[in-house]
UniProtKB/Swiss-Prot annotation:
One of its GO terms (molecular function) is cobalt ion binding. The lineage of its organism: Bacteria, Pseudomonadati, Pseudomonadota, Gammaproteobacteria, Legionellales. The gene is dapE. Pfam families: M20_dimer, Peptidase_M20. This is Succinyl-diaminopimelate desuccinylase. It comes from Coxiella burnetii (strain RSA 331 / Henzerling II). Its EC number is 3.5.1.18. Its cofactor is Zn(2+); Co(2+).
Length: 374
């Protein structure tokens, strides 16, 4: 059994449902320490984090990832227990197999092998690992990055081991991510009897035109690196608990996924202009869960693409598709950030799995990238 597969199995066996680490980080730390890495536990609240490094020079390349996973859902729908790593037809099944325990296993084994072969290597290799990526992401990577900045540690390059590939390992890498902003909107009307609408002010009726305008607004055209900004309602609630009452309020929640084309303030102002145009009485609360980032095709991305070409014989597609990742926190330091990991088709799904043959290739890509960088 390969070292990467063996480590992945050990990690899948730990039911590390966010924010519980379930002992995964102890396994990783013990392995890294055995080849000379220095490691620091950095717990914040109930979240487990660690920071590890080997070397004392620049450039500083970081591997980043998370040990937490989403809940397995209805376990009767799995063909094998979600926390029992199961090999079948060339694949290994288990919660976290794709997102992202395979990435973690491959990164750690690649770093081990590199340090064993190059004990006095140039540069510094580091790890940022958290158990708070699938949850609120408040006490995880963000706090570790703050800690490193307080210590004046300058990061140069970062590979996040998220499942970035689409159909084949290495066919895509992320060189940026859109931002995410939520709005909680309350439309204020006047409660009344449904038989006497002239004595009430129905917030549901009042909202229709404004909501249609928001849904149909073209916020931007996107650009060569980012798709157009997306606006989606995801929850609308109204009602007074009785069929003969016009409610006093309507509550709606919506989300923006946006490129660096806009600031959050610009989007907020545009929403409020639309609401004001339709003369709505409203209250709105905003929550910016992540800012967009774009690292572009820098030195790290160039070497990653070379490594993928050499090992997988693919011309990878750099893109910014998908949701958010912890790369957004690391990018705030000015570090070049890319995401490179396994195929993402089964992430968060029942019967999550990863191709076993891809594990060795992914390990080799990480190893080759280290060779090219330092």
């Amino acid at each position: 059994m390969s070292e990467t597969l063996n480590l992945l199995k050990q990690l899948i066996e730990r039911p590390s449902i966010t924010p519980n680490d379930a002992g995964c980080q102890t396994i990783l730390i013990d392995r890294l320490k055995s080849v000379g890495f220095q490691c620091e536990h950095l717990p914040f609240g109930e979240v487990h984090n660690f920071w590890a490094w080997h070397g004392h020079q620049s450039p500083f390349i970081i591997f980043a990832g998370h040990t937490d996973v989403v809940p397995p859902g209805d376990e009767t729908q799995w063909h094998s227990p979600p926390f029992t790593p199961t090999e079948k037809n060339g694949y290994i099944y288990g919660r976290g197999a794709a997102d992202m325990k395979s990435g973690l296993a491959a990164m750690v084994v690649a770093a081990e092998n590199f340090v064993k072969q190059n004990p006095d290597h140039n540069g510094t290799i580091g790890f940022i690992v958290t158990s708070d990526e699938e949850g609120p992401a408040e006490n995880g990577t963000q706090k570790v990055v703050d800690y490193l900045q307080q210590k004046n540690i300058k990061l140069d390059y970062c590979i996040v081991g998220e499942a970035s590939s689409n159909e084949k390992l290495g066919d895509a890498i992320k060189i940026g991510r859109r931002g995410s902003m939520h709005g909680e909107l309350t439309i204020i009307g006047k409660q009344g009897h449904i038989a006497y609408p002239h004595l009430a002010d129905n917030p549901i009726h009042r909202s229709f035109q404004a909501f249609e305008a928001l849904a149909k607004t073209k916020w931007d055209e996107g650009n060569e690196h980012f798709t157009p900004t997306s606006f989606q309602f995801y929850n609308v609630e109204a009602g007074a608990g009785a069929a003969n009452v016009i409610p006093a309020t309507l509550k709606a929640k919506f989300n923006f996924r946006f490129a660096p084309i806009h600031t959050t303030q610009q989007l907020q102002q545009k929403v409020e202009r639309i609401l004001n145009y339709y003369q709505l009485n409203y209250d709105i609360q905003w929550n910016v869960s992540s800012q967009p980032f774009f690292s572009g095709n820098g030195r790290l991305a160039t070497f990653v693409r070379q490594a993928i070409q050499e090992i997988c014989h693919l011309n990878t597609e750099p893109n910014t598709y998908g949701g958010t990742s912890d790369g957004r926190f690391i990018a705030t330091t000015g570090c070049e950030v890319i995401e490179l990991g396994p195929v993402n088709k089964t992430a968060h799904h029942v019967n999550e799995n990863i191709c076993i043959a891809d594990l060795e290739k992914l390990t080799d890509i990480y190893f080759r990238t280290l060779q090219l960088l330092i």
